[in-house]
A protein has these predicted regions:
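Proline-aspartate-enriched helix->loop->beta-strand connector
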Residues: 94-110
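Extracytoplasmic substrate-binding proteins
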Residues: 1-58, 83, 139-176
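Histidine- and/or cysteine-centered catalytic micro-motif in compact active-site loops
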Residues: 51-55, 86-88, 102, 110-111
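Alpha-helical scaffolding within the catalytic cores
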Residues: 34, 90-96, 126-133
Length: 176
């Protein structure tokens, strides 16, 4: 979120509305803190993979690397991203993901239908039926959380991604 806060501050200076920029940043920081408070301390015990899409349902998925908005969402909540790639959206095989045993899978909800796995229902069906993914504790434990894909790009909507994920975790048994 720091990059978003910086951009807001810089734009507020350019347009000579620093007070409004400061107020917006303070509001976003408060929302971020409230989301963290909702799940309490994760003590480094939670991990995740963020699945954006796949060119084919059973192809290696595009997942969030260690840079970009999804990585920032996870970091804001103290969640480890199991994907350690410097690419923003690398493709990683499900066998590799399963070996890393993420506590949760965050699945992007997309309005587009460029690829079959853009459909969130198709993602869920795949996870529940694939020979590898259906055995993952995150899938078996129903810790597959949907997130609007717009929250996964660096913008003001990142805060919605943080809040959505915090609410999903709080409603689950993950951080108890």
């Amino acid at each position: 979120m720091d990059i978003v806060y910086q951009e807001i501050t810089e734009l507020a200076e350019i347009f000579n509305v620093q007070d409004r920029g400061e107020k917006l940043v303070a509001d976003l920081r408060a929302r971020e803190a409230a989301a963290r408070e909702k799940i309490g301390s994760t003590d480094g015990k939670l991990s995740a993979v963020v699945w954006f899409s796949s060119t084919q349902v059973d192809a290696d998925p595009y997942v969030a690397g260690k840079f970009g908005a999804p990585a920032n969402i996870l970091s804001a909540l103290g969640i480890k991203n199991v994907i350690d790639s410097e690419e923003e959206w690398p493709t990683v095989g499900w066998e590799t993901i399963a070996k890393s045993n993420p506590s949760m899978i965050v699945a992007a909800k997309l309005d587009r239908r460029r690829y079959p796995a853009d459909d969130i229902a198709v993602k869920h069906q795949f996870l529940e039926n694939d020979a590898v993914t259906k055995l993952m504790p995150a899938v078996k434990g129903k810790h597959v959380f949907d997130m609007d894909a717009q929250s996964m790009s660096t913008s003001l909507r990142v805060i919605e991604g943080i809040e959505t994920l915090a609410s999903d975790i709080a409603a689950s048994d993950l951080n108890k």
